[in-house]
A protein has these predicted regions:
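His/Asp/Glu-enriched, well-ordered alpha-helical/loop segment
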Residues: 3-95
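C-terminal cap of metal-dependent C-N hydrolases
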Residues: 85-120
Length: 120
């Protein structure tokens, strides 16, 4: 698990972190997730963290997997969340624009298939 990326390096476990770590792990076939350390760094910054990894060479699809299905697999909950599949929880976020663009904002959110936020 990589992160938090938007935080000072005061904790021993992040002292040697680098924005290029995600690309290095990807290039070597290692499954990884990107995290924020919520509530210290709010979860709303997760797409920004993924975008920073993309800026440093991680492919966009790998960054998306790092904040969705890979995170769910590492947590052992991928049978319910992390991908859009029949039988999984229907937790979906729809964005105005690309989710890794810091100017984008969430247009709609569904949790368990129920709309909980709607700007459309």
């Amino acid at each position: 698990i990589i992160g938090p990326l938007l935080h000072e390096r005061s904790k021993p476990e992040v002292r040697n972190r680098s924005l290029t770590s995600a690309r290095t792990l990807f290039d070597n076939g290692v499954k990884f997730a990107i995290m924020t350390d919520h509530p210290v760094v709010p979860v709303q910054y997760l797409p920004v963290c993924a975008a920073l990894a993309v800026r440093e060479g991680l492919p966009e699809d790998a960054a998306l997997e790092a904040i969705t299905i890979n995170a769910a697999r590492i947590a052992g909950i991928d049978s319910r969340v992390g991908s859009l599949e029949v039988g999984n929880d229907a937790d979906i976020a729809v964005f105005y624009g690309h989710p890794f663009d810091f100017r984008s904002r969430c247009a709609m959110t569904l949790i368990n298939g129920r709309i909980v936020h709607d700007e459309l």
